[in-house]
């Protein structure tokens, strides 16, 4: 499971 969620 790969989660890419930038905190911008």
Swiss-Prot record:
Superkingdom of the source species: Eukaryota
Keyword Nucleotide-binding: no
Keyword Calcium: no
Keywords on record: Amidation, Hormone, Neuropeptide, Pyrrolidone carboxylic acid, Secreted
Modified residues (Pyrrolidone carboxylic acid): 1
InterPro entries noted in UniProt: Adipokinetic_hormone_CS
Modification Tryptophan amide, positions: 8
GO MF annotations in UniProt: hormone activity
Subcellular location: Secreted
GO cellular component, one term: extracellular region
GO biological process, one term: neuropeptide signaling pathway
Function: Hypertrehalosaemic factors are neuropeptides that elevate the level of trehalose in the hemolymph (trehalose is the major carbohydrate in the hemolymph of insects).
Family according to the record: Belongs to the AKH/HRTH/RPCH family.
Protein name, per record: Hypertrehalosaemic factor 1
């Amino acid at each position: 499971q790969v989660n890419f969620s930038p905190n911008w």
